[in-house]
């Protein structure tokens, strides 16, 4: 990058070289990602400052990186990824207070979601979508609280708590050709009312805080992996039904 300090040719000072090096370092840091993104330097008018040049360079890198990252995230969400991209996760990724969406299906709050899907995705009527999701969301566990390694199930007015330890993940291939990852946790000590295994699926494949998730639970680890018709779904308890509906339509 050539910098014109005046109309007459001059000799770059050591200080100018240091400023230049700082500008280049700033740009490369902002553009760091799995996919290398390049951007060209923009010629500046002599009245503009070095700082403005650096900011422009950084913004361009950040924009390109964000766009590439969003595309990759969307592909992963849809179930298209490489095995090498899958990483282990901690239970803390699902930490929080969660509510089942099943009651919102029952009271009609999610009807707008099914109408939206019918109109934009096709294949089923709104009523057919509702019936499909009714089977998927159905559960008697209306709330789940996860704190550190402890999971508490709220079922029929009663609470059941136990500690769970990480038991690896399984990559599943669905009939449609896309894939998903189940993150599995095992009950550390047998306790009344608690499943031996819980399996999370949230469309992510590496450490990240979940915004919602599908949960499978039972005492047979392998049998749970075959369950693809019933997937109780949980969103943060602080969200109301309409917020959840709009979040669903955004995906």
UniProtKB/Swiss-Prot annotation:
A GO MF annotation of the entry reads: zinc ion binding
* Keyword Signal listed: yes
Any Pfam family matching the protein: ZinT
Cystine connections: none
Q: Where is this region: Disordered?
A: 25-72
Q: Composition bias, kind Polar residues: at what positions? A: 25-41
Q: Which family does it belong to?
A: Belongs to the calycin superfamily. ZinT family.
State the protein's name: Probable metal-binding protein YrpE
